[in-house]
């Protein structure tokens, strides 16, 4: 499948010469200047012939390409390849549906297993929580018992301290009483020993002695009683000390045992906490897996629903195509997926490549207009051919680099709406058959319109130069991507009205133009706007045809007036738009031709009243489309300078006016 689009821009510049030109015609300086101008005109004519030859070769290539395209489209009307393609696509979709059904059953089994494991982990987690609750209750009970034992120990210590104080106080009191009694006894013994035995006194003393003796047993009994009480208190003191020691030892042992048990319980609690955290992490992991499985199941269900809609649309479209009845399409917007590497190029990719041409063509139009301004500015400023060639090559190379940079395809990573932890294989996307049919019909209409647009009419007789005829022979030298051809050398035959025939050397074929990069896929929505641009280009091409016809008539008049001698074609024809500075000997002349040229250049009786220069710049952009890839190249061709001499002469009396 081929389609070619041509873009031509014509720019004219005219310069007029005043009547002061007639005043210098008799001077020898004017003769030498006229001879130099004649040589320059011959050189320009030779350059124009080279441009014409290149133009003829381009037209020849276009004619061949259009003929092959017409044959291809005629053969495509007879082929029925879309039904087979759609049948294969439907079979592939059914196979994918069966595979997805098996994957769905497998995922359902995995979901059941995951649900069972989740229930088991729930039960384990519940049991662990109950066991931990029991341990917490036991720990709280033991803490309460330890607190009660500590309080009891403190109370016993306080009570023993009070008892010890009472024992000490009673012991001190009894010691004081005993010391007093002993003091009294000693005093009485001293009194008895020192007292004289006088009868009355003795009688009195005896009475007192009797009284004292009677009191001694009482006092002794009291003393014995006090001693027994003291012994009892001492025994009670020892008993209390023993009990206190035993209680202290019991408290110490209980504290140590409680510390050991608390340490053991703390270790058990820490282990249980770690187990609970591990169980929570495992539970969270399995919960995430279950959620991912549910999401994946939902995506699979959506994809199955989309495939069902696609199959329904295809069945409805095929039934409507067979029965001739309208059909309602059920479309669904879905995100594109990365196709598998094992499959080849499908129809959707081809349509996207075809649809992405217009933005690049706009960029080429801007580049061509910029080239045109640069080249016209250089010519107006009077640059030499060598400088002009260098600047043109630099601009051309820079634009080629920009074009390749803009036409390159940048593969961005696929942004998915939902990313799973475990990467799953994404099924291949399936194009919509109705959209493919519409895009294909629109493409065929555009190609047919382009074929109708570029059917050029045959050139008129008066548009050819009079007195000089150019015959260009040779086959095309451009290698098509799908049609192979053998480049052949071209020949040029120039004949004049005098009968001289000059056959130029072989013309080198046009070198193969560079292949562009593939366009970006994001430009496919611009395919619907190409019709308006094609209509605008058609109008421009009609205006360019009229300008070219006018220029052909003017060229015939120039050749009738000047009648230049024979010139031959240069040895090598440069590519369009590039004038090679490395070929200074563009004109190959003989001495006889130079004499004829100098003699015939100003053979007319009077010189023209005014001279006008016209510059015509033709810029072409050619784009090729094929079913394998898109090829785009451009030709910035020819700058033609034409000198128009008007033969109307003025009278001597009219010069002053």
UniProtKB/Swiss-Prot annotation:
InterPro entries: BFSP1, IF_rod_dom. The keyword Phosphoprotein applies. Residues 319-657 are annotated as: Tail. The keyword Membrane applies. GO terms for molecular function: structural constituent of eye lens. Residues 74-82 are annotated as: Linker 1. Residues 200-318 are annotated as: Coil 2. Residues 519-530 have a biased composition (Basic and acidic residues). Keywords: Cell membrane, Coiled coil, Cytoplasm, Cytoskeleton, Eye lens protein, Intermediate filament, Membrane, Phosphoprotein, Repeat. It comes from the Eukaryota. Residues 503-530, 565-593 are annotated as: Disordered. GO terms for cellular component: cell cortex; cytoplasm; intermediate filament; plasma membrane. The record marks 432-433 as: Cleavage (by CASP2, CASP3, and CASP7). It holds the Pfam family Filament. It is a peripheral membrane protein. Residues 1-38 are annotated as: Head. Residues 38-318 form the IF rod domain. GO terms for biological process: lens fiber cell development. Residues 183-199 are annotated as: Linker 12. Residues 83-182 are annotated as: Coil 1B. Detected in eye lens fiber cells (at protein level). Detected in embryonic eye lens. Required for the correct formation of lens intermediate filaments. PANTHER family: FILENSIN. Belongs to the intermediate filament family. This is Filensin. It comes from Gallus gallus. The gene is BFSP1.
């Amino acid at each position: 499948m081929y389609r070619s689009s041509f873009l031509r821009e014509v720019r004219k510049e005219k310069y007029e010469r005043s009547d002061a030109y007639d005043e210098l015609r008799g001077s020898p300086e004017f003769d030498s200047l006229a001879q130099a101008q004649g040589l320059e005109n011959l050189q320009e004519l030779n350059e124009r012939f080279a441009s014409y030859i290149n133009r003829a070769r381009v037209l020849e290539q276009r004619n061949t390409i259009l003929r092959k395209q017409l044959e291809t489209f005629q053969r495509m009307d007879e082929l029925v390849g879309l039904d087979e393609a759609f049948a294969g696509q439907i079979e592939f979709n059914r196979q994918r549906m069966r595979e997805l059904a098996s994957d769905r059953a497998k995922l359902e089994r995995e979901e059941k297993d995951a649900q069972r494991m989740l229930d088991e982990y729930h039960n384990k987690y519940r049991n662990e929580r109950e066991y931990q609750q029991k341990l917490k209750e036991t720990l709280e009970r033991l803490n309460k018992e330890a607190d009660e034992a500590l309080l009891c120990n403190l109370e016993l210590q306080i009570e023993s301290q009070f008892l010890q104080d009472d024992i000490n106080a009673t012991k001190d009191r009894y010691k004081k009483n005993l010391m007093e009694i002993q003091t009294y006894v000693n005093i009485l013994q001293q009194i008895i020993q020192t007292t004289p035995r006088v009868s009355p006194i003795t009688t009195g003393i005896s009475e007192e002695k009797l009284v004292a003796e009677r009191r001694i047993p009482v006092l002794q009994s009291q003393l014995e009683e006090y001693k027994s009480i003291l012994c009892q208190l001492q025994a009670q003191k020892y008993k209390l000390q023993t009990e206190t020691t035993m209680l202290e030892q019991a408290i110490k042992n209980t504290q140590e045992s409680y510390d050991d048990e608390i340490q053991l319980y703390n270790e058990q609690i820490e282990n249980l906490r770690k187990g609970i955290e591990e169980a929570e992490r495992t539970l969270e992991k399995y919960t995430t897996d279950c959620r991912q499985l549910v999401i994946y199941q939902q995506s699979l269900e959506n994809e199955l629903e989309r495939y069902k809609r696609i199959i329904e649309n295809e069945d409805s479209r095929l039934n409507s195509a067979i029965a001739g009845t309208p059909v309602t399409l059920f479309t669904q917007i879905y995100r594109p997926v990365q196709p598998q590497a094992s499959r080849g190029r499908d129809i959707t990719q081809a349509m996207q490549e075809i649809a992405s041409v217009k933005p690049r063509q706009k960029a080429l139009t801007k580049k061509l207009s910029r080239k045109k301004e640069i080249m016209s500015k250089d010519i107006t400023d009077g640059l030499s051919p060598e400088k002009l060639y260098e600047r043109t090559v630099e601009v051309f190379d820079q634009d080629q680099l920009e074009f390749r940079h803009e036409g390159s395809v940048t593969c961005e990573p696929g942004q998915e709406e939902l990313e799973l932890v475990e990467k799953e294989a994404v099924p291949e996307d399936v194009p919509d058959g109705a959209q493919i049919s519409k895009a294909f019909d629109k493409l065929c209409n555009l190609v047919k319109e382009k074929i109708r647009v570029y059917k050029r009419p045959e050139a008129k007789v008066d548009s050819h130069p009079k007195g000089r005829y150019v015959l260009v022979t040779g086959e095309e030298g451009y290698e098509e991507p799908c049609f192979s051809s053998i480049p052949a050398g071209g020949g040029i035959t120039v004949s004049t009205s005098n009968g001289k025939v000059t056959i130029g050397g072989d013309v080198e074929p046009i070198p193969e133009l560079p292949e562009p990069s593939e366009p970006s896929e994001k430009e496919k929505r611009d395919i619907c706007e190409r019709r308006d641009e094609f209509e605008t280009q058609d109008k421009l091409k009609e205006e360019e045809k009229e300008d070219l016809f006018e220029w052909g008539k003017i060229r015939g008049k120039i050749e009738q007036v000047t009648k230049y001698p024979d010139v031959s074609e240069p040895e090598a024809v440069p590519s369009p738009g590039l004038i090679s500075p490395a070929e200074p000997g563009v004109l190959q002349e003989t001495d006889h031709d130079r004499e004829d040229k100098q003699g015939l250049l100003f053979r007319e009786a009077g010189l023209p009243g005014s001279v006008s220069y016209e510059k015509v710049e033709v810029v072409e952009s050619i784009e090729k489309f094929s079913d394998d890839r898109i090829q785009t190249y451009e030709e910035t061709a020819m700058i033609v300078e034409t000198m128009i001499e008007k033969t109307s002469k003025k009278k001597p009396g009219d010069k002053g006016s």
